[in-house]
Regions:
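Short, positionally conserved secondary-structure boundary motifs
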Residues: 1-76, 109, 131, 149-157
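Short, hydrophobic/aromatic-rich segments at coil-to-beta transitions
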Residues: 62-66, 96-101
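Short, well-ordered loop/turn sites that connect or cap secondary structure elements
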Residues: 80-81, 94-95
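Structural motif
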Residues: 83-84, 99
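Hydrophobic beta-strand signal
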Residues: 87-88, 102
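Short, compositionally biased
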Residues: 97-110, 115-119
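Glycine- and charge-enriched low-complexity intrinsically disordered segments
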Residues: 115-157
Length: 157
């Protein structure tokens, strides 16, 4: 299957962008300053800021990376929420058990952990309200890529 066919199928699920078609974005980055999530610390002036290419940081392989919007809550316990944008690297199609993967099963796409045991593959959600999906011998199954970053807005309290 070629990339254009893949993209057409995925676009039926939601929004998809090729990373190499997204304009570069440079922003100020304070690499020598750590912000604590405890008591406030003084922050120096903007002279310490360095420029960082956000797209290059998120997408080390832009020609093989796609941005895909999530629908659903099967991965909520891994902090992947409906509406988030996933950065998916297609150059890695062999996820570890701790990496979230975008997978194609019988022509449909899903985001799950891929676990292999007893000669079988399972798609494992990060939400106890969803069952694990066993990949059977007759199923068409492919790992489409590994999720490298999740972009989402912080939840308000």
């Amino acid at each position: 299957m070629n990339n254009e066919t893949d993209i057409r199928k995925i676009k039926k699920v939601g929004q998809v962008w090729r990373a190499d078609e997204v304009a570069s974005l440079e922003m100020d980055f304070f690499s020598d300053i750590n912000v604590v999530a405890g008591f406030p610390i003084p922050l120096s002036n903007d002279e310490r800021a360095k420029k960082i290419d956000v797209l290059r940081m998120l997408c080390p392989h832009p020609d093989a990376t796609y941005l895909i919007r999530v629908e659903g809550d099967s991965m909520i316990d891994s902090n992947i929420c409906s509406g988030d944008i996933l950065v998916v690297d297609k150059s890695n199609r062999n996820p570890s058990e701790n990496e979230v993967a975008m997978c194609e099963v019988n022509g449909e796409y899903t985001v799950k952990f891929v676990r292999r045991h007893d000669g079988k593959s399972w798609l494992v959600p990060a939400n106890k309200n969803y069952p694990e999906i066993e990949i059977n011998d007759g199923d068409e199954f492919n790992v489409w890529g590994v999720v490298t970053f999740v972009i989402h807005q912080p939840q308000s309290v």
